[in-house]
Amino acid sequence: MTVTLERRESTSLWERFCSWITSTENRLYIGWFGVLMIPCLLTATTVFIIAFIAAPPVDIDGIREPVSGSLLYGNNIITGAVVPTSNAIGLHLYPIWEAASLDEWLYNGGPYQLVVLHFLLGVAAYMGREWELSYRLGMRPWICVAFSAPVAAATAVFLIYPIGQGSFSDGMPLGISGTFNFMLVFQAEHNILMHPFHMAGVAGVFGGALFSAMHGSLVTSSLIRETTENESPNYGYKLGQEEETYNIVAAHGYFGRLIFQYASFNNSRALHFFLGLWPVVGIWLTSIGISTMAFNLNGLNFNQSIVDSQGRVINTWADIINRANLGIEVMHERNAHNFPLDLADNSLLPVASSSPSINS
């Protein structure tokens, strides 16, 4: 018997590191995008938790009226938030070393900018990591394309909108009630409910939820039973099996009779592509809408669009919405010297035909 011994080529530490980073045998795939994602998301998460619990009030409007957002300063889980960076900072990058002290950095809302920028980098890297793992496994790249929709939405509200409005103070606060406040103010200032792209996003999200529920219930109701009546049908499924796990013909026939013939898919690939496409395109369109409204290309305006023969306005729902928008905008302005543009831009109404003479 002949035994051949070959000298094992020595690999450098860097090569072993590269092999470990890109290995698909790890329990959790890291990848080169993961090298960026992990520190960014850890930083964003850590600072968010600390700021949500203990950050001091922030002068969000830059008018020396700090707003409290943390739990230790009187808030609860519902009202708490990481308050956006001060309007006094605007769009300037505001790392800790740009402030004169840590107290100043906290007062001006530095944690918000730190969390948002690291979070956006992290989720973008997560999307790239999805593509990277798909590539290494020989899969198609549609998973990261689908995830691009929430990435686009987050980028729109946390980065594009502040850029368009000229200050990070206009970004969405990182909290529950802060999110609702952002939505109300956005409606008041941009009439988003009357924007076609927002309507498409609503159809995408709610339609996607409806289609998902319909698909899941149809599949669950048409499983191919491989077990006896006394056992769960789930025991008849083996991970990775080549056979179909449900009868798409039965599901197609059921749904075709429930609605009409052409309302159902008879091709599983086309069906699942549609299920992925519908909500993704809707959220893409909403993100584009937010990004255009960031630069004040607002929703449609049908205010006072109907008048009678005497020129009197006949109010429609558009006028009701406009009245609500004005009320929200007035309540939003905490600084009494800052009137909403809708109220401040009206032409002056004369109160006298001529000025009275004043005897000196």
Swiss-Prot record:
Pheophytin a binds at residue 126. A quinone binds at residues 215, 264-265. Disulfide bonds: none annotated. It is a multi-pass membrane protein. CDD domains: Photosystem-II_D1. The record marks 161 as: Tyrosine radical intermediate. PROSITE patterns: REACTION_CENTER. Its EC number is 1.10.3.9. The chain crosses the membrane at residues 29-46, 118-133, 142-156, 197-218, 274-288. PSII is composed of 1 copy each of membrane proteins PsbA, PsbB, PsbC, PsbD, PsbE, PsbF, PsbH, PsbI, PsbJ, PsbK, PsbL, PsbM, PsbT, PsbY, PsbZ, Psb30/Ycf12, at least 3 peripheral proteins of the oxygen-evolving complex and a large number of cofactors. It forms dimeric complexes. This is Photosystem II protein D1. It comes from Cyanidium caldarium. The gene is psbA.
